[in-house]
């Protein structure tokens, strides 16, 4: 589904005109090939039972890593009445600062049980950028920490704000649904490059609010048990 770079060049588009770099920061190394990821437009074998199972497991692992990180911080101050806040660090993806900020604004205006906030301490997940044949994806670093990788070329082919908001949806617990319509944010690259919708639909908003009301409560219980030991 990716558009060849030569076609983009012929159309007068380039990494520079799109505000994207040509190489990621040295620290923004993609996850190793074969590591489980939740990709924007699916893996080469998308649609197979094995692939669907692997993606579901990767999405669950990513969400649980973020949830656990947030819950352990909250356990230190369990009586707080403040909204649940998920802290991210976007310093590893400077080329996408605008898209990340926009994606954060979209999600914060769409759901009420959780908030996304930029920060450099108490970070729950990070953004990275670079080139990877798998495109953009959400994954874990092997140490229980989640991150979102934003691929340069894919963000030329597809609407970059939609890609970023979609991947951020995995942070909040939503799985991919490539067969969905453009109005469904988590359909990712399924509807094709012409789809520019970067907003979750009502079902997606409701699911996130439910996950962070119910799922977070369970994660908090585990975090409190751990802190009491």
From Swiss-Prot:
This is Extracellular small neutral protease. Keywords: Calcium, Disulfide bond, Hydrolase, Metal-binding, Metalloprotease, Protease, Secreted, Signal, Zinc, Zymogen. Its EC number is 3.4.24.77. It comes from Streptomyces sp. (strain C5). The keyword tRNA processing does not apply. InterPro entries: MetalloPept_cat_dom_sf, Peptidase_M7. SUPFAM superfamilies: Metalloproteases ('zincins'), catalytic domain. Pfam families: Peptidase_M7 (PF02031). Binds 1 Ca(2+) ion per subunit. Its cofactor is Ca(2+); Zn(2+). Belongs to the peptidase M7 family. GO terms for molecular function: metalloendopeptidase activity; zinc ion binding. It catalyses: Hydrolyzes proteins with a preference for Tyr or Phe in the P1' position. Has no action on amino-acid p-nitroanilides. Disulfide bonds join 182-195. Residues 1-28 form the signal peptide. Monomer. Ca(2+) binds at residues 159, 161. Optimum pH is 7.0. Zn(2+) binds at residues 166, 170, 176. GO terms for biological process: proteolysis. It is found in: Secreted. Residues 29-81 form a propeptide. Gene3D superfamilies: Collagenase (Catalytic Domain) (3.40.390.10). GO terms for cellular component: extracellular region.
């Amino acid at each position: 589904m990716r558009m060849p770079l030569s076609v983009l060049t012929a159309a007068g588009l380039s990494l520079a005109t799109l505000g994207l770099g040509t190489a990621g920061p040295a620290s923004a190394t993609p996850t190793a090939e074969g590591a489980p990821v939740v990709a924007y437009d699916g893996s080469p074998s998308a649609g197979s039972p094995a692939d669907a199972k692997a993606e579901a497991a990767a999405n669950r692992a990513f969400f649980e890593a973020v949830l656990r990180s947030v819950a352990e911080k909250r356990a230190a101050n369990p009586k707080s009445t403040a909204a649940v806040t998920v802290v991210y660090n976007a310093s590893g993806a400077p080329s996408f600062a605008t898209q990340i900020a926009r994606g954060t604004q979209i999600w914060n205006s769409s759901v009420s049980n959780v908030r996304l906030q930029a920060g450099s301490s108490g970070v729950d997940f990070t953004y990275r950028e670079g080139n990877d044949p798998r495109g953009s994806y959400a994954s874990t670093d092997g140490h229980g920490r989640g991150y979102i990788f934003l691929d340069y070329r894919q963000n030329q082919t597809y609407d970059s704000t939609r890609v970023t908001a979609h991947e951020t949806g995995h942070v909040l617990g939503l799985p991919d649904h490539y067969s969905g319509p453009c109005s469904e944010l988590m359909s990712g690259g399924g509807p094709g490059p012409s789809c520019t919708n970067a907003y979750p639909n009502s079902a997606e908003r409701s699911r996130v609010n439910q996950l962070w009301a119910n799922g977070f409560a369970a994660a908090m219980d585990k975090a409190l048990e751990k802190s009491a030991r």
